[in-house]
A protein has these predicted regions:
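Helix-loop segments that flank and shape redox-cofactor active sites
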Residues: 35
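Active-site-proximal, glycine-rich beta->alpha crossover segments in alpha/beta enzymes
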Residues: 1-12
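Histidine-acidic metal/acid-base catalytic patches
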Residues: 12-24, 28, 38-182
């Protein structure tokens, strides 16, 4: 069967093989963390926590090897310190999916409004860490609830994602202005 090490070795083999083309074309790869961040159905998960990123960047140090920083996937693992990770890897985060989770049991959670006070993910702390770390990538609100009677694909409600985009835009503006005052 597939082991953690075999899967990691295959990922490293793939990334090393494509890095010359990424260098030539100026393309950044941005691996999305495993969702959820624990093994499921006998399948190993290898990009779940800070140590996994450290191992990946040690194996493939090329700066075109980067991250999609998904606060939903990483936040499902209560063991992850998301603001710390955001700041540590800010120069390797090329795409950020920011969303809020509310824990409902040991491994159960549900997605909620993007504001920090709506759940257990410190969205403000993450945005602050990204800005302080020099983040220069793309951001989008990840998943939205269906609100106000909206009939949309689950997780992709337009209204909630639009509110999330406005909230995140405001957070980035506030953090950047606060940093410029210091």
């Amino acid at each position: 069967g597939m082991t953690h090490q075999k899967l990691f070795d295959n990922l490293v083999y793939f990334l090393k093989a494509i890095m010359p083309a990424c260098d030539e074309a100026g393309v950044n790869m941005a691996i999305h963390p495993d969702d959820p961040p624990w093994d499921m159905f006998g399948l190993p998960r290898i990009i779940c926590k800070e140590e996994d990123y450290d191992n990946l960047f040690a194996a493939v140090p090329n700066m075109h090897n980067g991250i999609t920083f998904c606060t939903g996937s990483l936040g499902a693992g209560r063991f992850n310190d998301l603001p710390k990770m955001a700041k540590k890897y800010a120069n390797r985060i090329y795409f950020a999916h920011l969303r809020q989770l509310k824990y409902d049991g040991e491994i159960n959670f549900y997605e909620n409004g993007h504001q920090t006070d709506c759940g257990n993910v410190d969205v403000y702390g993450i945005v602050k860490a990204l800005v302080e770390g020099g983040f220069d990538g793309y951001v989008r609100p990840d998943h939205g609830r269906n609100v106000w009677g909206e009939d949309a694909k689950p997780g992709y409600g337009l209204f909630d994602r639009a509110m999330g985009a406005c909230y995140l835009s405001g957070l980035f503006e506030a953090v950047e202005k606060d940093m410029n005052r210091k």
